[in-house]
Structures are given as structure tokens and as C-alpha cells.
């Protein structure tokens, strides 16, 4: 199983929310099943995401690449520092990250 493949599948068949503000909001409310944060995301954003995700019992996966690489992987012409998986759709991304 490949993270890139499963992430694209989740984007196509599920509900994926991009952006740090929305990701933090979903972490606060417990509205995400998984949060992915880029390795080089700003420290303040990462701290908020990890804090609220822990309170809401949401797993956080740190993407090994940069926010530019994460945006490119998703086919977006902009950087993506973090994203929230609300519905994985047909992807198996939740199982991949739990390993």
C-alpha cells in the first residue's frame, strides 16, 4: 500500500479538507478521522494540530516531505501544510497510517 496512491484515492472518493485553519477547526471538534501534516509545517500550526488532535483522539501522521511536495502529490498548484481526512471514501489510508 502506498501513501500517495491512497491519499489520491481519498481525495477522489472521500472527503479531504485542505488547509491548516480548517484542519485545526476539525481537530478541535473531532470532525476528522485522520490528520496529515507536512514535515516543514510551521511549529505553531503543528503544535495546535497535535494538541487538539490528542484531545479529540484523532491520529496525526507526519508526512515525510515538505508542504510543497504534499501539494504536488495532491495535484494542487499550492503548498499544503496540513489536511484532514473526514471520510476516507474507497481508500485504505486509515489502515496504512495505523501501521
UniProtKB/Swiss-Prot annotation:
GO MF annotation list: RNA binding; structural constituent of ribosome
Stretches assigned to coiled coil: none
Any one Gene Ontology BP term: translation
Keywords, comma-separated and alphabetical: Ribonucleoprotein, Ribosomal protein
Annotated InterPro entries: Ribosomal_eL30 (IPR000231), Ribosomal_eL30-like (IPR039109), Ribosomal_eL30-like_sf (IPR029064), Ribosomal_eL30_CS (IPR022991), Ribosomal_eL8/eL30/eS12/Gad45 (IPR004038)
GO cellular component: cytosolic large ribosomal subunit
Source organism, top-level taxon: Archaea
UniProt keyword annotation of Ribonucleoprotein present: yes
SUPFAM superfamilies in UniProt: L30e-like
PANTHER family linked to this entry: RIBOSOMAL PROTEIN L30
Family matches, as NCBIfam families: PRK01018.1
Family: Belongs to the eukaryotic ribosomal protein eL30 family.
Protein name, UniProt field: Large ribosomal subunit protein eL30
Organism (species): Pyrococcus horikoshii (strain ATCC 700860 / DSM 12428 / JCM 9974 / NBRC 100139 / OT-3)
Gene behind this protein: rpl30e
